[in-house]
C-alpha cells in the first residue's frame, strides 16, 4: 500500500511540475502586451507649453505664432478652451487669444 502512495505522489508531482511552466509563460506574454498598451496611452492627453516666455515670443514673432496656432488647432484646442490655459487678466494674453480666434476664422 505504501508503494501505491509513493507512485501517486510521484505522478502528481510530475504532472504539477509539467503544467507549472505554461501559466508563467502566458503571464509574461500578457505583461509585455500590457506594457505596450501603457506606452500608447501617453498620447491621449496632448499638452501645450504655455510658459510665459513662449507666449511672449508668440506675440512678437508672427511666424512662430502661426506655427503654434497650427499646432493648437491640430491638437483640438478651441478658442473657448484657451481661457483655461491663458491668464486672461493679462491684456497681452487676451490679445493672443483674440489673434487665435481670428486665425481660426480664416
Curated annotation (Swiss-Prot):
Query: Where is this protein found?
Result: Secreted; Host nucleus
Span list, region WY domain: 50-106
Q: Does the keyword Signal apply?
A: yes
**Signal sequence region:** 1-20
Question: Annotated motif RxLR-dEER: location in the chain?
Answer: 33-46
Q: Which domain of life is it from?
A: Eukaryota
Recorded GO cellular component terms are:
extracellular region; host cell nucleus
Region named Disordered: 29-65
Q: Where is this motif: Bipartite nuclear localization signal (NLS)?
A: 56-69
Please give the chief subcellular localization of this protein.
Answer: secreted
Q: Give any Pfam family that matches.
A: RXLR
Keyword annotations: Host nucleus, Secreted, Signal, Virulence
Q: Which family does it belong to?
A: Belongs to the RxLR effector family.
Domain statement:
The RxLR-dEER motif acts to carry the protein into the host cell cytoplasm through binding to cell surface phosphatidylinositol-3-phosphate.
Query: What is the protein's known function?
Result: Secreted effector that possesses RNA silencing suppression activity by inhibiting the biogenesis of small RNAs in the host plant to promote enhanced susceptibility of host to the pathogen during infection. Interferes with secondary siRNA production by associating with host nuclear protein PINP1 that acts as a regulator of the accumulation of both microRNAs and endogenous small interfering RNAs.
According to the record's subunit comment, the protein's assembly and interactions are: Interacts with host PINP1.
Q: What is this protein called?
A: RxLR effector protein PSR1
- Provide the species name: Phytophthora sojae (strain P6497) (Soybean stem and root rot agent)
Amino acid at each position: 500500500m505504501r508503494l501505491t502512495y509513493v507512485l501517486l505522489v510521484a505522478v502528481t508531482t510530475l504532472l504539477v511540475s509539467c503544467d507549472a511552466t505554461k501559466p508563467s509563460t502566458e503571464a509574461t506574454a500578457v505583461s509585455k502586451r500590457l506594457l505596450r498598451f501603457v506606452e500608447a496611452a501617453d498620447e491621449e492627453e496632448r499638452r501645450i507649453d504655455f510658459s510665459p516666455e513662449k507666449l511672449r515670443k508668440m506675440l512678437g514673432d508672427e511666424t512662430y505664432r502661426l506655427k503654434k496656432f497650427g499646432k493648437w488647432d491640430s491638437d483640438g484646442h478651441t478658442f473657448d478652451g484657451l481661457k483655461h490655459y491663458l491668464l486672461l487678466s493679462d491684456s497681452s494674453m487676451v490679445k493672443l487669444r483674440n489673434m487665435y480666434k481670428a486665425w481660426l476664422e480664416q
